[in-house]
Amino acid sequence: MLLFVGLGNPTPDSENNRHNIGFKLIDALNQKFGLSKQKPKFKGLLTTGNVEDKKVYAIKPLTFMNNSGICIRELIEYFKIDAEDVIVFHDDLDLEFGKVKAKFAGSSAGHNGIESIDKFIGKDYSRVRIGIGRPKTKADVADHVLKDFDEDEMIQLEKITKNIIDSMAILIDKKLDLFSSTVNNK
């Protein structure tokens, strides 16, 4: 059993923000694999089903980015999911736009959603970092992550999302380096 988590903020005006790339991945996963209708549970929107013959849960926390860990802890305790079986999709400033890097454990690199999850379940889970690039000045970081993708970026994002979803079998097997290189080289 696996838990996929997409990080984002739950307001309608945040839908196309760079910070909401995790939500977009969960939506694509739900659509591609025909997971159940999203239901409000565990302070998030929860779906369930099978991906590559593996039972999965997928959630978009409704607690806002900085409190995502609360939702995740409740869910893994209820379903008795090990932290090692959690895979989190999130934006990453330190990766070039469109690049993907999957890894197990490690630091939050200043990402508040990851810091919250670390606080509530520890660091031993997988992360799929999706590059949104860094703004030119440090002062612009908050504006950058909360800004909508532009039209060209949305087109690229569709391709990136498709590559990630098409490579799910590799991710489910937790071959994280192979997953990253496969997605980045499609």
From Swiss-Prot:
Keywords: Cytoplasm, Hydrolase, RNA-binding, tRNA-binding
Primary localization class, coarse: cytoplasm
Residues at the catalytic site: H19 (proton acceptor)
Gene Ontology MF: a single term: peptidyl-tRNA hydrolase activity
GO cellular component: cytoplasm
Residues reported to bind tRNA: F64, N66, N112
Intracellular or extracellular location(s): Cytoplasm
Catalyses which reaction(s): an N-acyl-L-alpha-aminoacyl-tRNA + H2O = an N-acyl-L-amino acid + a tRNA + H(+)
EC number: 3.1.1.29
Site (Discriminates between blocked and unblocked aminoacyl-tRNA) residue list: N9
Marked site positions, Stabilizes the basic form of H active site to accept a proton: D91
Listed GO biological process terms: protein quality control for misfolded or incompletely synthesized proteins; rescue of stalled ribosome
Function: Hydrolyzes ribosome-free peptidyl-tRNAs (with 1 or more amino acids incorporated), which drop off the ribosome during protein synthesis, or as a result of ribosome stalling.
Family: Belongs to the PTH family.
Subunit structure and binding partners: Monomer.
Name of the protein in its database record: Peptidyl-tRNA hydrolase
Protein's gene: pth
